[in-house]
């Protein structure tokens, strides 16, 4: 009995540490990008996956101690996919006492009609979903739309665009929506996916599978995700350094004439950002820039619990 109590206390201790880390990450992102302001009504897009559950939980937690007042309304889009457990989210949100709205739109039928069997449907589905969510935000009087993308999603998008699109373009933590009427925020921008996975398992969120539509996975994104995970295992701190690089861009040392006036450089121009280091021996730090070792990840393994299977 004492051993069971000891393990329970340890699990709770580790869960509290993990929640504090996620809360700190979200709080820093909100502050750095001014994501939430006094009186904001935040529409939290809830898919039923680990990321959106975690986002809602951390925002609710921050709401209790934030120096400003803001409200939350959770929104789920029921796209009429076969086997979608429509009872799960209402029951969960009512138990929490969170204001919510379930939007029912048969986008699944539209996608199946337009996209050949076996092909990836995510692109069309995403466009349809985006339009519906913008409309819903207007109807609810939401001032911000919160999406559950995390740090790993942002880095994956950067590499996808570099490898396949020829652009250095990631996923912004805050942006104006396509229709120019809404501000979209990503409060989990600084959060590691592996932390979110552990938190979701420990909290036993009622996860809804994301493959109910039967669409094939994005193989290009999967390749990038596997590459980043491999780097993270083999070279601890590399992911942190790459993300830090996205926050320390030096346009004068790239090749985009829209970002820096290369043509305007003449004799007598000032040295910019350290000048030319091409002939210098670069001093590479022993540890990646911006990286600090987290607490022993093995200690967090105690958080691993079974995720509720949705029948």
UniProtKB/Swiss-Prot annotation:
Subunit structure: Homodimer.
Positions contributing to [4Fe-4S] cluster binding: 122, 125, 213
Gene: ttcA
Record GO terms (molecular function): 4 iron, 4 sulfur cluster binding; ATP binding; magnesium ion binding; sulfurtransferase activity; tRNA binding
Keyword hit for Transferase: yes
Pathway where this protein functions: tRNA modification
Family membership: Belongs to the TtcA family.
Listed name of the protein: tRNA-cytidine(32) 2-sulfurtransferase
InterPro entries from the UniProt entry: Rossmann-like_a/b/a_fold, TilS/TtcA_N, tRNA_Cyd_32_2_STrfase, tRNA_thiolation_TtcA_Ctu1
Main subcellular location: cytoplasm
The keyword Ribonucleoprotein belongs to this UniProt entry's keyword annotation: no
Function: Catalyzes the ATP-dependent 2-thiolation of cytidine in position 32 of tRNA, to form 2-thiocytidine (s(2)C32). The sulfur atoms are provided by the cysteine/cysteine desulfurase (IscS) system.
């Amino acid at each position: 009995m004492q051993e069971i109590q000891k393990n329970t206390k340890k699990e709770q201790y580790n869960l509290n540490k993990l929640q504090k880390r996620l809360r700190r990450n979200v709080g820093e992102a909100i502050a750095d990008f001014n994501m939430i302001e006094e009186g904001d009504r935040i529409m939290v897009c809830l898919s039923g996956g680990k990321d959106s559950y975690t986002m809602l939980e951390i925002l609710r937690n921050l709401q209790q101690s934030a120096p400003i007042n803001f409200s939350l309304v959770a929104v789920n889009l029921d796209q009429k996919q076969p086997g979608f457990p429509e009872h799960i989210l209402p029951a969960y949100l009512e138990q929490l006492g969170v204001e919510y709205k379930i939007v029912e739109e048969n986008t699944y039928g539209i996608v199946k009609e337009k996209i050949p069997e076996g092909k990836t449907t995510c692109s069309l589905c995403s466009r349809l979903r985006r339009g519906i969510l913008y409309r819903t935000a207007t109807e609810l009087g939401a001032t911000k739309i919160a999406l559950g993308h995390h740090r790993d999603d942002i880095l994956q998008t950067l590499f996808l665009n570099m490898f396949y699109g020829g652009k250095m373009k990631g996923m912004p933590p805050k942006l104006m929506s396509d229709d120019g009427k809404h501000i979209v925020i990503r409060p989990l921008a600084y959060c590691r996916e592996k932390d979110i996975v552990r938190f979701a398992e420990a909290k036993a969120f009622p996860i809804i599978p994301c493959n109910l539509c039967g669409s094939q996975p994005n193989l290009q994104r999967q390749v990038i995700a596997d590459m980043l995970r491999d780097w993270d295992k083999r070279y601890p701190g590399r992911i942190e350094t790459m993300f830090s690089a996205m926050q320390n861009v030096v346009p004068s040392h790239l090749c985009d004439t829209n970002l820096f006036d290369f043509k305007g450089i003449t004799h007598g121009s000032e040295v910019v950002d350290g000048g030319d280091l091409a002939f210098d021996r670069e001093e590479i730090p022993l540890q990646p820039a911006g990286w600090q070792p987290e607490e022993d990840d093995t200690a967090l393994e105690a958080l691993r619990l079974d995720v509720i299977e949705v029948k």
